[in-house]
From Swiss-Prot:
It comes from Staurastrum punctulatum. Its cofactor is heme b; heme c. This is Cytochrome b6. One of its GO terms (cellular component) is chloroplast thylakoid membrane. CDD domains: Cytochrome_b_N. The keyword Secreted does not apply.
Length: 215
């Protein structure tokens, strides 16, 4: 086993990478509130894992979506637990994200030279809210349907571009199968991919610049 490790170590310098990841100076003023960002990330990982598990059973059609969710909850082994954890971690992600934003703002973590870290954080907050909006519609029950109808109808008040924007969001003039398909694609593919990329940028900036000092 030692020879195998030495072979990889010689080529990839694994120990140097491990030392860089595990050994980082932590300022003495850091407290438990500085862990909120890590909790958001952990919640996101749980979301990805549980969401991926549910894609094996969920059917993104207006006629089968609700029934497939009921099937997950009542027939699939531990399906109720997987979906419940998905919902709980979603709430945890939103709550800790809000607290994280407040912590960064109140401690001045957005100031020079960390402006871009703040910008990527704001983008991540928008993506997180988008997760909530798109995911809320997927069970395609009364609450989900009317929530989508209201949310997608908001841009209609914008002059000139309002109506085309509503049609772009819904996939048609009215809420229906095209809307559910778009929201499902956004929720399971587009948003997770964008979030992962922006999170990576966010973390790399934090690693490069370190944790901001006290006020």
């Amino acid at each position: 086993m030692g020879k195998v490790y030495d072979w990889f170590e010689e080529r990839l310098e694994i120990q140097a990478i491990a030392d860089d990841v595990t050994n980082k100076y932590v300022p003495p003023h850091v407290n438990i509130f500085y862990c909120l960002g890590g909790i958001v990330f952990t919640s996101f990982i749980i979301q990805v894992a549980t969401g991926f598990a549910m894609t094996f059973y969920y059917r993104p059609t207006v006629t089968e979506a609700f029934a497939s969710v009921q099937y997950i909850m009542t027939e699939v082994n531990f399906g109720w637990l997987v979906r419940s954890v998905h919902r709980w971690s979603a709430s945890m992600m939103v709550m800790t994200m809000i607290l994280h934003i407040f912590r960064v703002y109140l401690t001045g973590g957005f100031k020079k030279p960390r402006e871009l870290t703040w910008v990527t954080g704001v983008i991540l907050s928008v993506l997180t809210v988008s997760f909530g909006v798109t995911g809320y519609s997927l069970p395609w029950d009364q609450i989900g349907y009317w929530a989508v109808k209201i949310v997608t109808g908001v841009p209609e008040a914008i002059p000139v571009v309002g109506a085309p924007l509503v049609e772009l969001l819904r996939g048609s003039v009215s809420v229906g199968q095209s809307t559910l398909t778009r929201f499902y694609s956004l929720h399971t593919f587009v948003l997770p991919l964008l979030t992962a990329v922006v999170m990576l940028m966010h973390f790399l900036m934090i690693r490069k610049q370190g944790i901001s000092g006290p006020l």
